[in-house]
From Swiss-Prot:
Lineage, broadest ranks: Bacteria, Bacillati, Actinomycetota, Actinomycetes, Kitasatosporales
One MF annotation (Gene Ontology) recorded for this entry: transferase activity, transferring phosphorus-containing groups
Keyword Oxidoreductase: no
Keywords of the record: Exopolysaccharide synthesis, Transferase
Highest taxon, organism lineage: Bacteria
Record organism: Streptomyces coelicolor (strain ATCC BAA-471 / A3(2) / M145)
Protein name, entry field: Exopolysaccharide phosphotransferase SCO6023
Disulphide connectivity of cysteines: none
GO BP of this protein: polysaccharide biosynthetic process
E.C. no: 2.7.-.-
Coiled-coil portions: none
Other notes: Stealth proteins are part of a protein family that is conserved from bacteria to higher eukaryotes. Family members were first identified in microbes as proteins that help pathogens to elude the host innate immune system. Microbial stealth proteins are involved in the biosynthesis of exopolysaccharides. Stealth proteins are predicted to function as hexose-1-phosphoryltransferases.
Keyword Transferase among UniProt keywords: yes
C-alpha cells in the first residue's frame, strides 16, 4: 500500500470521524497549514511502522495457516484493513470480486448438499443467499472447508449492520460468528499488485439464515422482494444480472444462480434498457491540432482559448478505468475526437467506437471546431448511440461503484444533479465567462418557453441524457442550436445543451427529475488541491468527481501534471480493456 498520502493514516481518519466539523475548523484556523501537513506526515510515518508490524504478523500468519499461501499466488497483510490477508491479483474489480464470492459460497454449499436460493438484497454490490436455520451446522462446516482454498472472511451482521470484526473462516472467532449470526457476511479480500486498490466485504456474499415460522421460512432482515417463502417453493435458475443492477446486463453473459420465482421477476425499479457512454476528447499537445487551431482566430474571452482547457494529462485513460471498474453495466463507449486517438487506446475493442467530428456535423463548413459547446450540440447524431446515455468529459471520474438507477429511473426519466452554484443574474455581456454566457442564453430560451427563471448550474458530473430529447431541443430552438454548432470557438451566443439546457428542458417536459449524487469538484489551480486529492484517495467515498483546470495560467503545468498523475495512478491502478496491453502498465 502506498505510504506517501498523509491523508490516509488511520490517525487522521479517526480525527475526522470523531472530532466535530466545527471544532476541526477552529483548529484549522489556529494551526498553520504547514504545521498541519508536517503532523500528518509524522502520523503517516508512524503508520508505516504499524504496516511493518502487520507485515510481520502476516509472516506469522503464513506459518500458522500455510495453506493460505499457495504457490503461484501472492498474499500480504495490508495495513488499514484490520490485518486481513488479501489475495493479490493483476486484475481487480468490484464486479469480479462480487462474482467470485458468490461462486465461492455457492460451490461450498452445493458440495455440502445444503439447499439455498438467491435473494434480491438491498445492496446491488453484494450477493445474498438464503439457507434454512436448520442447516446452520452444515453451513459452518462448509465454510471451514472453503477456507482451505484461500483466505475467506466472515462477519456477523444484524440487518445490514456488522456486529463483529471480520474473522477468518475456520478460526475460533469465525466459528463463533458462524454459530450465532443471523446474517453471515462472507468473502475474500482482493488487492491489486501495488496495494492501492483493496476490495473486501463490501462485495461479499451474505448468507442469511431463514427461520421456520407457521410453516414458512422467514427472512432475518428486509430484502427487496419477500419476507417469507414456503420451504417447498420451486427453485428456478436465472442469470445473476436478473438480481442486481450492477451486473453487465447488455455486454456479457453472467453466471446463473438458483433462486425462487418471487425473486426472479423484474421489479418496477429495474433499469433494463441499454446505456451507452459518450466522451468528447482533444489532445491539445498534438502539433497538427495546434496548427489547425492557430489558423483561426481565438475565442471572445480569455477562458475560451485558455491553453489549460486543452492540456492532455492522460485523464481519459483513467476515466475509462474508472468507468470499467465502477459501471460494468455500460453497453458501449463512443469517443468523439477531431481525428485523434491516444497512442495507448485499444480502438479495436468491440465496446468502443471512435467517432470523428465529420461523422456528426452535417455541415462541413462548421469544421474544424474548437468549441466544446458546438461539439456537444451534435452528440445525438452519433450513429448507433443508445436512447439513454451518459455524457462525460475526460476530467470526470466515477469514484466508486454505481448502478444505472443512480442516473436513470426505470421509466426512462433522467436524473439531474443541480449545483449550489448559480447562473449570474445580470443580462449577457462581453465580459461574461463562456459558461456564464451560455447559462444566461439557456435561461432566456427556457423563460420564453416555460415562464420560469433558472438559477442553479449543474454539477460537473456524468450527465444522464436521452437522445430523443436532444433531437427535440434541436427542433425546438433551431436558430440557437445552429449558431452554437457553427461557432468555431466558444461564443457569447452559445447555448450549453448537455451540461445545462437539456436538464431543465427535460424537467419542464416531465422527462427528468432532480436527484443527488455524492460528488466532489477539484480545481488544480487551487492551493488546497493536493490535500483534497489525498482525502479523496484515502476515503474513496464519492460516486463521482471532477478534476478541472479553469484558473491556471500555464506556469505550474509540470507540478500539476505530476500531482494528478500520482493521484490517478493510485486511485485507478488497474488497466481497462480499452488500453493496448503492451502499453497498459504505467
Amino acid at each position: 500500500m502506498s505510504t506517501g498520502n498523509p491523508e490516509a493514516s488511520a490517525a487522521v481518519g479517526a480525527y475526522r470521524s470523531l472530532v466535530p466539523a466545527g471544532l476541526r475548523r477552529r483548529v484549522a484556523r489556529r494551526v498553520p497549514a504547514g504545521l498541519r501537513t508536517v503532523l500528518k506526515h509524522l502520523l503517516r510515518r508512524l503508520h508505516v511502522l504499524s504496516l511493518a508490524s502487520r507485515l510481520f504478523r502476516g509472516f506469522r500468519a503464513r506459518r500458522r495457516w500455510p495453506h493460505l499461501f499457495r504457490e503461484g499466488e501472492r498474499l500480504a497483510a495490508l495495513a488499514g484493513h484490520g490485518d486481513r490477508i488479501a489475495l493479490v491479483r493483476p486484475t481487480v474489480s468490484p464486479l469480479g470480486l462480487r462474482e467470485a464470492n458468490l461462486e465461492l459460497v455457492v460451490t461450498a454449499l452445493e458440495e455440502a448438499g445444503v439447499d439455498y436460493f438467491a435473494v434480491r438484497g438491498t445492496s446491488d454490490f453484494r450477493s445474498v443467499l438464503a439457507v434454512a436455520e436448520s442447516d446452520r451446522e452444515q453451513v459452518g462446516r462448509a465454510l471451514e472447508r472453503c477456507a482451505g482454498h484461500g483466505p475467506v472472511y466472515l462477519r456477523a451482521c444484524r440487518g445490514e449492520t456488522p456486529q463483529a470484526r471480520p474473522a477468518l473462516a475456520g478460526s475460533r472467532a469465525g466459528r463463533q460468528q458462524a454459530r450465532h449470526a443471523a446474517v453471515l457476511r462472507t468473502g475474500m479480500v482482493w488487492s491489486d499488485p501495488t496495494g492501492s486498490l483493496v476490495l473486501g466485504l463490501e462485495h461479499s456474499c451474505d448468507i442469511e439464515f431463514w427461520k421456520p415460522e407457521a410453516g414458512r421460512l422467514v427472512a432475518p432482515r428486509p430484502n427487496r422482494v419477500t419476507q417469507d417463502v414456503s420451504p417447498r417453493e420451486p427453485r428456478v435458475t436465472v442469470p445473476v444480472s436478473r438480481l442486481t443492477g450492477f451486473a453487465a446486463l447488455h455486454t456479457r453473459r453472467t453466471r446463473s444462480v438458483r433462486t425462487v420465482a418471487a425473486c426472479a421477476d423484474a421489479l418496477p425499479e429495474d433499469v433494463r434498457f441499454p446505456i451507452d457512454v459518450v466522451y468528447t476528447w482533444v489532445d491539445g499537445n498534438d502539433p497538427a491540432w495546434r496548427r489547425r487551431r492557430s489558423a483561426y482566430d481565438g475565442g471572445y474571452h480569455a477562458e475560451s482559448a485558455n491553453a489549460a482547457r486543452y492540456i492532455s494529462r492522460d485523464e481519459l485513460r483513467y476515466s475509462l478505468r474508472a468507468l470499467e471498474q465502477n459501471a460494468p453495466w455500460v453497453r458501449h463507449v463512443h469517443l468523439v475526437t477531431d481525428g485523434q486517438r491516444p497512442a495507448w487506446l485499444n480502438d479495436s475493442h468491440p465496446r468502443l467506437t471512435v467517432v470523428d467530428h465529420s461523422e456528426i456535423f452535417a455541415d462541413p463548413a462548421a469544421l474544424p471546431t474548437f468549441n466544446s459547446h458546438a461539439i456537444e450540440s451534435r452528440l445525438h447524431h452519433i450513429k448507433g448511440l443508445s436512447e439513454h446515455f451518459l455524457y462525460l468529459n475526460d476530467d470526470m471520474f466515477l469514484g466508486r461503484p454505481v448502478t444505472p438507477q443512480d442516473f436513470f429511473l426505470s421509466n426512462g426519466m433522467t436524473r439531474t444533479f443541480f449545483s449550489p452554484s448559480q447562473v449570474p443574474r445580470p443580462d449577457p455581456s462581453p465580459a461574461d465567462r463562456p459558461v456564464d454566457a451560455a447559462g444566461k442564453n439557456n435561461r432566456r430560451l427556457l423563460l420564453e418557453n416555460f415562464g420560469s427563471v433558472i438559477v442553479q448550474k449543474l454539477r460537473h458530473a456524468p450527465y444522464a441524457l436521452r437522445r430523443s430529447v436532444l433531437e427535440e431541443i434541436e427542433r425546438e430552438y433551431p436558430e440557437a442550436h445552429w449558431e452554437t454548432s457553427h461557432s468555431r470557438f466558444r461564443s457569447p451566443t452559445d447555448i450549453s445543451i448537455p451540461s445545462s439546457l437539456y436538464h431543465y428542458y427535460a424537467y419542464f417536459t416531465g422527462r427528468a427529475v432532480p436527484s443527488d449524487i455524492r460528488f466532489a469538484y477539484l480545481d488544480l489551480a487551487r492551493p488546497e488541491v493536493a490535500r483534497r486529492l489525498g482525502i479523496l484517495l484515502a476515503r474513496r467515498d464519492r460516486q463521482a468527481f471532477c478534476i478541472n483546470d479553469t484558473l491556471s495560467d500555464g506556469h505550474d503545468v509540470d507540478r500539476q501534471t505530476e500531482m494528478l498523475a500520482t493521484f490517478l495512478s493510485a486511485y485507478y491502478p488497474v488497466p481497462s480493456p480499452f488500453e493496448r496491453k503492451e502499453r497498459a502498465a504505467r
